[in-house]
Each structure stands twice: as structure tokens, then as C-alpha cells.
Regions:
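N-terminal secretory signal peptides and thylakoid transit peptides that target proteins
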Residues: 2-18
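Conserved N-terminal/central alpha/beta ligand/cofactor-binding core
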Residues: 14, 35, 68, 74-189, ...
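Beta1/beta-strand and adjacent pyrophosphate-binding region of the FAD-binding site
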Residues: 40-52
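Aromatic pocket-lining residues of Rossmann-like dinucleotide-binding sites
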Residues: 62
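Glycine-rich loop(s) and the adjacent beta-strand/alpha-helix scaffold that form part
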Residues: 217-307
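Conserved small/polar residues in nucleotide/adenosyl-binding loops
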Residues: 344-351
Length: 351
């Protein structure tokens, strides 16, 4: 290995170590004692951090229940990564399957998940998906989401076709109609360019948050969470609770490499640029216990010549993987089970 490559590797290691140290410090200092807050700028029943699928659903449910809700989104538009994802949703034992004679069951779905998840799944949560997925489909349809009619996708890792395909082709097919419903609720306030900074604690209880209004995300910074100081700080009291729906950290070059050293800073991502670990780090600092953070998901369908998700995925995923074969262009030989789970197909593509 050349001296230049060694120097570059050492520099990346040093940078990651420094960032890890800063993040550890941020986590250790997470949480502001409520006694130090002289006066709250705002007061709501529920404060939601993030505006993707989870945040939107929470805002709608709480808002329709008559609660006063504040939803904070750090980016200039709502939706987060949910707005640009593929939008397909697996729902075992659904009416479309029944009409088409597709035999599915709770046991088969859980077995598929356990196989793909290497047995690390929380089975009680898988059961909850089976119990509630049809309610979820009805919920988003009632909001105005439209699925491809009478159609089930047969996606990798599943034993039978069980996934609904959104007509819009992306998660925007859910986000837009859900947001339209939220805008009808006068008791729900949505703020964009509003970045969560910290929790306000009364003992072990989260009673509010601080955030910055007028924040401007800066993709040119190595770590926007650590370096960006834009915006005016506000304090908000949450009388009933704070909902964390800030999404993943696929664009956080330091945090993701700490979890999986293979994901170097030059590794591209299909996620929107604001998918960083700032909220997660603060949550860890006050004792949150997320599970299996190091199990990152790779997507084997994308084109390295395209930025992010690209458009080639529409062919590779829905045509090649479903109806064709994948071959090594150097040997012309097939080298994977095209219908296997993402973990298997991603590892096969990387070899």
C-alpha cells in the first residue's frame, strides 16, 4: 500500500476518532435541567421531532384527539427521507392477497423476517406488524394515499407477494396527502428550518425541548450537527410528551462509520442530506436504548454512476430481480439468488 494511502487512512481514522470524541461529549452533556429554564417560549401538549411517516402519523393522531401539537422539521421542506423512499409496504394477510388467492399467514411472515433478520428480530414487534398493518393501510388510504389497484409486489426476502405499491412511485404518495390532512387541523403547528437541539429534563422525565428557529442546513460542513450554529434558540414545554421521529443517520459520515467501519466517508447514500445522527446522539445521552444501531441496510439495486437512489433501481429491482437473473459481467455467470433478502444480495454484489 502506498504511503499516500496509508496517510489518507490514518487521517480518516483520526477524523472519525475526533468526531466520536465530540459526539461522546455531546451525549454526556445532553439534557437541560428544567430548573434552569426561566420561562418557556412556547407550550404544547405534544412535541414531535421529524416530519416523515412516523412524525406525520403522530401529528394526525394527536391532533385529531384534540391535543395541541408542534412538529419540528430541520430541513426546508417536510417529509424527510420518507418522501423519497420507494414507498412499498409489506402487509401480510391483506384483502388483495385474499382476492387473488395468495396464501399468507402470521407464521409465514414472521418466519420470513426471522430468516432475513438472522434471528435477531423482536418477535412481539413482528406480531404487532401483522396485527396492525391493515389498519395502517386504511389509515393512509383515508388520508388520500393511492396504491396500484389489485396488485401485490413480490419483493426480495418474502415467500409470497404481500407488498402494496404506492401509485406515486415514492413515499411522497403518503407524505403529501398526510400533510394535506395535517394542514386542516388548527391545533397542529408545523415548523420547518427548526432544528432540535436538546431535551429539557425534570429529573428523569423529558418535559420539553430546545430548538433553533430559522436554522439553515449546510451540506458543505463535515458535520452539520456539530458545526452549524444558525438560528435563534427557543424553549418549548411538552405537557404530555416528546415524540422522536427524526429518522436514520445514513448521511452522518462519522456516526455511520463508527457503527460499521466498511462505510467510509466516500460511500454514497440514497438518503436525503439531512439524515444525520444529532437527535439520536442526544437521546443516547439521556438514557435512550435503541437496538441494533450497527445493522446498517445496504441497497444492491442502485447504479454507482448515479447519485443517491437514481432511476436504474426501477429496472434492477422490479424487472431484473423479479423476472431475470444477475450475472457477473466479467464471467457471464449468475452469482446470487435474486429474490433473497437485502443482506444476502448486498453481500453478494460486494464480493
Amino acid at each position: 500500500m502506498s504511503e499516500m494511502n496509508l496517510c489518507r487512512r490514518n487521517l480518516l481514522k483520526a477524523g472519525a476518532a475526533a468526531a466520536a470524541g465530540i459526539m461522546a461529549s455531546a451525549a454526556a452533556n445532553a439534557g437541560i435541567p428544567a430548573a434552569k429554564v426561566e420561562k418557556y417560549d412556547e407550550e404544547y401538549d405534544v412535541v414531535i421531532i421529524g416530519s416523515g411517516f412516523a412524525g406525520m402519523a403522530c401529528a394526525l393522531k394527536a391532533g385529531r384527539a384534540g391535543k395541541k401539537v408542534l412538529m419540528l422539521e430541520k430541513m426546508p421542506v417536510v417529509g424527510g427521507n420518507s418522501a423519497i423512499c420507494g414507498g412499498n409496504v409489506a402487509c401480510p394477510v391483506n384483502p388483495v392477497q385474499k382476492a387473488q388467492g395468495i396464501k399468507d399467514s402470521r407464521e409465514l411472515f414472521i418466519a420470513d423476517c426471522l430468516k432475513d433478520g438472522l434471528g435477531l428480530n423482536h418477535v412481539e414487534l413482528l406480531s404487532k406488524i401483522v396485527d396492525r398493518c391493515n389498519d395502517t393501510i386504511k389509515f393512509v388510504e383515508d388520508c388520500g394515499a393511492e396504491f396500484v389497484p389489485n396488485h401485490m409486489l413480490f419483493e426480495g426476502g418474502h415467500s409470497v407477494p404481500r407488498s402494496y405499491e404506492i401509485k406515486a412511485g415514492t413515499g411522497s404518495g403518503y407524505i403529501h396527502p398526510m400533510y394535506d390532512q395535517i394542514k386542516k387541523l388548527s391545533n397542529v403547528t408545523v415548523k420547518t428550518r427548526a432544528k432540535f437541539d436538546d431535551f429539557i429534563l425534570d429529573g428523569d422525565a423529558v418535559v420539553g425541548v430546545t430548538y433553533r428557529e430559522g436554522y439553515r442546513f449546510n451540506a458543505k460542513l463535515q458535520s452539520d450537527d456539530l458545526e452549524n450554529k444558525t438560528g435563534k434558540t427557543k424553549t418549548v414545554r411538552a405537557k404530555l410528551g416528546v415524540m422522536l421521529a427524526a429518522g436514520g443517520f445514513s448521511r452522518d459520515i462519522w456516526f455511520r462509520q463508527i457503527q460499521d467501519p466498511r462505510v467510509v466517508p466516500t460511500t454514497d447514500s440514497t438518503n436525503q442530506l439531512g439524515a444525520t445522527a444529532g437527535v439520536l446522539v442526544k437521546s443516547l445521552g439521556i438514557g435512550a436504548a435503541p437496538v441494533q444501531l450497527c445493522w446498517l441496510q445496504f441497497l444492491p439495486y442502485t447504479n454507482p454512476r448515479e447519485k443517491g437512489f437514481g432511476v436504474s433501481v426501477n429496472f434492477t429491482n422490479h424487472a431484473c430481480m423479479d423476472f431475470g437473473i444477475v450475472v457477473d459481467r466479467k464471467t457471464g455467470k449468475r452469482f446470487m439468488d435474486e429474490h433473497a433478502c437485502l443482506l444476502y444480495t448486498s453481500d453478494a454484489a460486494d464480493e
